[in-house]
Amino acid sequence: RNQHGDEGRAGGHGSFLDDMGSATDLGRRAAQAVLRASDGRGPPTALTAAILAHLHVESEAPLPALLGARGDERTRTAQLAPVVTAAAEQGDQVSLDILKDAAAALAPSALAVANRLGLKKPTIVAVGGLVASSPLYRDILHAALLRLIEDASVQGPVHSSAYGAALLALR
């Protein structure tokens, strides 16, 4: 929000069209990395064993059906995000690269809003389940944001989402 009360938004238009940096995006990137590792197009990754265990399967073969053909693919895919962050915290380079790539894809949304609202030194509030649950991803996202908008300050929400919902309900 700028000094005139104008608000801006960029991104967040659903998992099919635009969900860069979300839990679903991380899960999709992780599944892609596992499939590429399995056929030799990508490097080996700790994600393979972690995702197979998480999904209770013995090989990569059922991943496309499990994550894309049952109508609940967005939820199932998003549920892989904690697997990615855990593997990154354990030093898996592929997982760390996924976090960095997702944050780099999300950060331009904040820049677009800052530019649209004419904010030179914006305060960016990073919210969402993934940001809240993973200090590592939050730090990577903060760094990506500061690379794009040097004078920005990045913080978490001041109030809970329930507080925000209550305020909206009062309007």
Summary of predicted features, one role per range:
Residues A31-R171:
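ATP-binding/phosphotransfer module of carbohydrate and carboxylate kinases, centering on a glycine-rich
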Residues R1-P44:
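Phosphate-binding/catalytic loop of phosphoryl-transfer enzymes
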